[in-house]
Amino acid sequence: MEILMGNIIGIDLGTTNSCVAIIENGKVKVIENSEGDRTTPSIIAYTEENEILVGQPAKRQSVTNPKNTFFAIKRLIGRKFTDHEVQRDVNIMPYKIVSSENGDVWLNVKNQKVAPPQISAEILKKMKKTAEDYIGKSITEAVITVPAYFNDTQRQATKDAGKIAGLDVKRIINEPTAAALAYGLDKKTGNRIIAVYDLGGGTFDISIIEIDDVDGEKTFEVLSTNGDTHLGGEDFDSRLINYLVNEFKKEQGIDLRNDPLAMQRLKESSEKAKIELSSVHQTDVNLPYITADSSGPKHMNIKVTRAKLESLVEELIYKTLEPVKTSLKDAKLKIIDIKDVILVGGQTRMPLVQKKVSDFFGKEPRKDVNPDEAVAIGAAVQGGVLAGDVKDVLLLDVTPLSLGIETMGGVMTTLISKNTTIPTKHSQIFSTAEDNQSAVTIHVLQGERKRSIDNKSLGQFNLDGIAPAMRGMPQIEVTFDIDADGILHVSAKDKNSGREQKITIKASSGLSENEIDKMLKESEANAELDIKFEELVKTKNQADHLLHSTRKQIKEAKNLPLEKKTEIEKCINELELSIKGEDKKDIEIKIQSLIQISSCLVDFSKNKENLNKEDIIKTNKKENNNKTNDDVVDAEFEEIKDKKN
């Protein structure tokens, strides 16, 4: 596989963490963010100062700002508020999930309704800037990954998020397929069929992929895919959180579910405990002052063993194996046909997950694929393919769910079956169900059920102007066209009159093209102001940290001369006054003045034996540097068998 140099970045937009990669000097490189990490928490916070925080900065303040700190947005994107999975999250998320006017999922951000793609766009902006800072020039094109089992609306909503972030999304690629590209990148020998088991923070996918290698030319063909877009590490966390809440209630008689701050602290500790239990057999969840009642403060200190955690989540792991069985059946394969098993997603680091997958396939999963980075690497490879930088690679992906229309009797008639290789196009002739019917409604559906009502409604449109005729006489040609992103385009044509209507199925993001363009223009126009605001806030935060540490040092200082104390307090007052304004330069000057004048405090510190003047200066320097759908009109179609020419 020959690799040159390209500028189409690959982004793994994850539920829990996101990652960005690019092709550089013939190799794929995962890029570190501004905090020095190769992955970025998919967390976005909106502060009282109107600052938007992304990643670790957002995560750090989540305990004190739970209602405006958003995580696991990927579980909500492209969904309806009434969806069962959404209603489950409504009851457990610290932030407020609301319904838009048309019934889509939106979020309450500081008492304003915001669409999930708009929030996800902030993560994509961070990934974009991470890449730009690394290569030193503007990035406008990207390949973004989605769970293989994402439906059409979820895919389109992801593209909307990319557009809002200022990115031209060249391709939406399935996460397991991307992982297969990463796995097959350097493999030189032979053809093989692999299983990609992808258990991430919020979603689960299984894909069966055949890699053909003929004279160095590699074809990655997805044979089948299946999954659950609402099953992942967040659900594992929830099981542990519920256990801890119940144990605490038994001990103290207090239900922490009524305390958002306590629940946010518990979520962080539960995630940490879960991760620790992948390498140790017991850990403590120790949260002092978790809550209080009339008798005083209450503390949580509960031991959790690996065995206990496994008993809590084992059912979830077994739940992932059902789609695996279905995917093998759809591919007409047996377990023995699988050559390699690739684990992707952070939750696959759990020993019990690895054991259950190993037991199922009868072989140990590969250990040479980084589960946190493989998807972004594969996305970068696909970006290279699109740019012409990666040679001798052909990717054949599939549509995860069947697509069709509602016909007579409320039945879904399938036009494109699940696991059909994309891009693809299929047409079928339908007719009217009543005499002199002048219009039909094309109701587009996605799913595997026979009853239309049991499937996902993607949208509908009308074809009118049909010439009067007996029922069954007009010929209406319905065409489904799926592009390489897995996004559906539908047309209906009256073959007698030539009248035609088309629709591109759009996401349930509640965002029109005009709204998306407006958000993008606002983002671009305010970019410089946003940077200045961010720098000002960082400087004010540094000043706050310095004021806090200086006051603490004054309290600890022994025999501090009154004259010196007065001098330091004057500088403190000047800095406090300065941070009430908007002059960043003045704040910086006042910071430096306070650092200089307070450096003498070390000489009077109670901890002088452990702290010298150099340490104080280093500390201060460090602080400076860390700156609803309409009712369906009956679409009464009667299928006419295709006439052969």
Swiss-Prot record:
It comes from the Bacteria. The modification Phosphothreonine is found at residue 203. Keywords: ATP-binding, Chaperone, Nucleotide-binding, Phosphoprotein, Stress response. CDD domains: ASKHA_NBD_HSP70_DnaK-like. Induction: By stress conditions e.g. heat shock. InterPro entries: ATPase_NBD (IPR043129), Chaperone_DnaK (IPR012725), Heat_shock_70_CS (IPR018181), HSP70_C_sf (IPR029048), HSP70_peptide-bd_sf (IPR029047), Hsp_70_fam (IPR013126). PROSITE patterns: HSP70_1 (PS00297), HSP70_2 (PS00329), HSP70_3 (PS01036). GO terms for molecular function: ATP binding; ATP-dependent protein folding chaperone; unfolded protein binding. Pfam families: HSP70. Acts as a chaperone. Belongs to the heat shock protein 70 family. This is Chaperone protein DnaK. It comes from Wigglesworthia glossinidia brevipalpis.
